[in-house]
Amino acid sequence: MAHIVKIYDTCIGCTQCVRACPLDVLEMVPWDGCKASQMASAPRTEDCVGCKRCETACPTDFLSVRVYLGSESTRSMGLSY
């Protein structure tokens, strides 16, 4: 079952989530929205196994990276009927 990895604009560009991911699902991309001038991106979500290490590593009060597992993804993204 596919997982959705969502990066929110509260990302501070610290790279903690990228370093925590054992499967290199995440990478940093240029972004002018924070002091670090970069933010996390999830170009390889098909490789995500749902371990949520990226969430655990995120230091922001509102998790900037969220992993929605399987059926949770449609409910969390507001797609359930």
Curated annotation (Swiss-Prot):
For the keyword Chloroplast, the answer is yes
Quick one: which residues bind [4Fe-4S] cluster 1?
A: 11, 14, 17, 58
Q: Which GO terms describe its molecular function?
A: 4 iron, 4 sulfur cluster binding; electron transfer activity; metal ion binding; oxidoreductase activity
Which cofactors does this gene product need? [4Fe-4S] cluster
Q: Where in the cell is it found?
A: Plastid, Chloroplast thylakoid membrane
Q: Name one Pfam family in it.
A: Fer4_7
Give the UniProt record's GO annotations in the biological process aspect: photosynthesis; photosynthetic electron transport in photosystem I
Q: Which UniProt keywords apply?
A: 4Fe-4S, Chloroplast, Electron transport, Iron, Iron-sulfur, Membrane, Metal-binding, Oxidoreductase, Photosynthesis, Photosystem I, Plastid, Repeat, Thylakoid, Transport
Q: Per its UniProt record, what SUPFAM superfamilies does this chain match?
A: 4Fe-4S ferredoxins
Q: Is Magnesium included in the keywords of this UniProt record? A: no
PANTHER family the record matches: PHOTOSYSTEM I IRON-SULFUR CENTER, PHOTOSYSTEM I IRON-SULFUR CENTER-RELATED
Subunit comment for this entry? The eukaryotic PSI reaction center is composed of at least 11 subunits.
Q: What is this protein called?
A: Photosystem I iron-sulfur center
